[in-house]
């Protein structure tokens, strides 16, 4: 059977490379060769970082949903960094924390620019295929996601661009290199359109508001250049945007409902109690459902959403009135408490209105550090913050689920807010884990987690450099009109246009996370939000946290492990560990402790009982230090001979106690005084030229008795 081969070869006639620079480094876009079945795709090359970006839209809208089903996935392949996954299957598993956080960072600026009425599934995928540590794959992925969506036929009001900003020696640096990031006081990511800022994410070492705003402005200048580059590609190969099927509520029906029931909604919502408000809305919705039987469950949910949104926004814009009656710059009632849970190492509870978070702090040894298996160069993490949002916190009767993207994002925000004030590892070598349990949620739980973490850390005796507090600022816009309000609650977050979260100390900002539902913010709005959050943060620090616990406790909890550190010569590490780990395992078992020996000779010993840790330190010292003549040791009898007993004073170090030096009185037989396995005190009397150690139990007993007598006399 003959096999015929076609003479035609794929020439990729539509393939083209577009080139520019981003923050001084080459930036290339390859289109027309790969992923031909996506709506649009591009391979982004930033330095030697390569990210494959794709966007796909379903041909038909998804039925039965009242939201736009957008899915943004950032994938890290370990082959990009020349590594094999450490899992049993040696295959990448579920997305790691860094990948989830990057997916959120790309999702948040892109989502507001899609039509809210669209119900077609849209999936944006960014796959890191090669990693250059000096060229951020997150920024390459964000720009690539923006580019492919803008080029595709999918309706979208982009493009956007993104830039990272560092602050090195007081100078603003765009897209800092790996070495610059290590020295930077700022890790800021900004996304923007040509005119407005659409996303801000930051961790900072107490940076002031003016410097932060200048960094955002510097980022925007570079972003405008990349947007101009994207627009040139869109002009050349962009596809016409398709019309989509609008799935939603009949607006004539909605206007009729609004005219009839507006006063009822206003009366129901005029309360500061979320439960009362929700209960008052139920009979109104029952009446509407009875009057309009053709409305589906999704339609009724949309009616409720639109009516509440209309009331909240009109009250704010027309009357300056908030749902709970507060002033625009007024914070809800606050409370703080520490030492709530007796057996945990530290605990703190922070309450803001109907939002309440209980945070615990647990201390562990260096071996409790979290192992990282992603593309980052950081292999372990010593400070961990976890955020849990159980259903009961919002009054829902359902089983709890494992943490999702929201929980991971909120936990990371609180984690970044506290990292700048943690003590150096040399000063405080513990692993620190904070867990924030949301007990009740009515907005700003992530900021309550920051405050709760400060309380728990100080209650645990962690010597933080300064207390940290967090607060959020909201926004309502209508055309050119806008209004910001401090400390937004749930209904204002849900129906407002912005949730601007800022954590920091008295000195400056340590973390920012900005979410918006509109097409962007002006510098004036950002500056006002910064100032309101600064004043609110100082109030919480001075009036709420300081009176409860002004500084970290001077002693750790009695239940916390006690940790000691020491340095040993690197050539002695093998002696401490022993063959197959036998020596170190014996020390851990005997002293009931944990020991971590690092490559540079640092040894960390932790134990709940301080005396156990000290015994382990002493044992390690006896191993690495040569025995001193005149020093007294506690050793174990290993062998009995006619002429004496051999005693191990440290692993691998054995000496002889001659029968004449076994006791203060004459000894006829060695076994009359000691047996194999006995623990006895001995004194080093001599070390000969061959390194053999001579010991005396008699001299040790006499020396200890003399010391005791001296103490009794003195």
Name each model-derived stretch.
Residues 153-268, 457-554:
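Mobile "lid/hinge" segments at catalytic clefts and subdomain interfaces of large enzymes
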Residues 559-565, 570-714:
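Single-stranded RNA-binding regions, centering on S1/OB-family and related RNA-binding modules
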Residues 38-122, 128-130, 135, 201, ...:
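Glycine-rich, flexible beta-strand/loop modules in the N-terminal catalytic cores of phosphate-handling
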Residues 40-43, 135-153, 338-361, 442-462, ...:
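Conserved phosphate/anionic-ligand binding catalytic regions in large, soluble enzymes, centered on
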Residues 2-245:
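Long, basic N-terminal domains or extensions that often function
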Residues 108-116, 151, 340, 365, ...:
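Conserved helix-loop functional segments at active or binding sites
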Residues 116-122, 157-159, 226-244, 275-276, ...:
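Flexible, glycine/charged-enriched surface loops at secondary-structure junctions
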């Amino acid at each position: 059977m003959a096999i015929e081969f076609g003479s035609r070869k794929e020439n990729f006639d539509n393939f083209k490379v577009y080139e520019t620079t981003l923050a001084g480094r080459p930036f290339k876009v390859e289109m027309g060769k790969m992923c031909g079945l996506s709506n649009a795709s591009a391979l982004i090359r930033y330095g030697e970082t390569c990210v494959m970006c794709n966007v796909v839209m379903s041909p038909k809208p998804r039925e039965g949903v009242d939201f736009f089903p957008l899915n943004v996935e950032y994938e890290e392949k370990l082959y990009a960094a020349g590594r094999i996954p450490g899992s049993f299957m040696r295959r990448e598993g579920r997305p790691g924390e860094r990948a989830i956080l990057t997916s959120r960072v790309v999702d948040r600026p892109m989502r507001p620019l899609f039509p809210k009425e669209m119900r077609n599934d849209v999936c944006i995928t960014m796959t890191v295929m090669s990693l250059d540590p000096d060229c951020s794959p997150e920024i390459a992925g964000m720009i690539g996601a923006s580019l492919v969506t803008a080029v595709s036929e999918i309706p979208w009001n982009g493009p956007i661009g993104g830039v990272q900003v560092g602050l090195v020696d007081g100078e603003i640096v765009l897209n800092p290199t790996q070495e610059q990031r290590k020295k930077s006081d700022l890790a800021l990511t900004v996304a923007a359109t040509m005119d407005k800022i659409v996303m801000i994410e930051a961790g900072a070492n107490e940076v002031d508001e003016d410097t932060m705003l200048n960094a955002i402005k510097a980022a925007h200048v570079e972003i405008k250049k990349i947007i101009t580059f994207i627009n040139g590609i869109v002009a050349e190969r962009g596809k016409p945007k398709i019309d989509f099927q609008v799935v939603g509520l009949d607006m004539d029906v909605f206007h009729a409902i609004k005219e009839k029931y507006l006063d009822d909604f206003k009366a129901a919502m005029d309360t500061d109690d979320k439960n009362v408000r929700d209960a008052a809305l139920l009979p109104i919705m029952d009446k509407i459902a009875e009057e309009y039987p053709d409305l589906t469950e999704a339609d009724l949910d949309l009616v409720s959403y639109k009516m509440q949104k209309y009331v909240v926004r009109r009250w704010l814009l027309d009357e300056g009135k908030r749902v709970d009656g507060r002033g625009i710059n007024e914070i809800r009632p606050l409370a703080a408490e520490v030492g709530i849970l007796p057996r945990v190492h530290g605990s703190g509870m922070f309450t803001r209105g109907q939002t309440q978070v209980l945070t615990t702090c647990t201390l562990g040894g260096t071996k409790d550090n979290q192992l990282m298996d992603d593309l980052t160069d950081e292999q372990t993490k010593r400070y961990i913050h976890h955020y849990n949002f159980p259903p009961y916190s919002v009054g829902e009767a359902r089983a709890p689920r494992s943490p999702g993207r929201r929980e991971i994002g909120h936990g990371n925000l609180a984690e970044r807010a506290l990292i700048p004030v943690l003590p150096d590892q040399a000063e405080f070598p513990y692993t620190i884990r904070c867990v924030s349990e949301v007990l009740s949620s009515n907005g700003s739980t992530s900021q309550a987690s920051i405050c709760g973490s400060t309380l728990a850390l100080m209650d645990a005796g962690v010597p933080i450099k300064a207390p940290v507090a967090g607060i959020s600022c909201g926004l309502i816009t209508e055309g050119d009109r806008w209004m910001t309000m401090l400390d937004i609650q749930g209904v204002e977050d849900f129906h407002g246009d912005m949730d601007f979260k800022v954590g920091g100390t008295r000195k400056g900002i340590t973390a920012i996370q900005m979410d918006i539902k509109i097409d962007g913010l002006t510098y004036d709005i950002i500056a006002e939000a910064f100032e309101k959050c600064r004043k609110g943060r100082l109030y919480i620090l001075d009036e709420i946290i300081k009176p409860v616990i002004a500084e970290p406790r001077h002693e750790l909890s009695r239940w916390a492990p006690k940790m000691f550190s020491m340095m040993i010569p690197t050539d002695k590490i093998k002696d401490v560990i022993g063959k197959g780990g036998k020596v170190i395992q014996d020390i851990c078992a005997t002293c009931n402790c944990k020991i971590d020996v690092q490559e540079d000779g640092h040894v960390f010993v932790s134990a709940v009982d301080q005396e156990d840790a000290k015994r382990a330190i002493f044992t390690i010292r006896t191993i690495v230090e040569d025995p001193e003549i005149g020093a007294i040791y506690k050793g174990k009898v290993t062998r009995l001979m006619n002429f004496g007993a051999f005693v191990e004073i440290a692993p691998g170090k054995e000496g002889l106690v001659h029968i004449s030096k076994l006791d203060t009185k004459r000894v006829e037989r060695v076994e009359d005084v000691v047996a194999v396995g006995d623990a006895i005190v001995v004194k080093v009397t001599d070390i000969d030229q061959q390194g053999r150690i001579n010991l005396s139990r008699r001299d040790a007993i006499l020396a200890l008795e003399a010391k005791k007598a001296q103490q009794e006399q003195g």
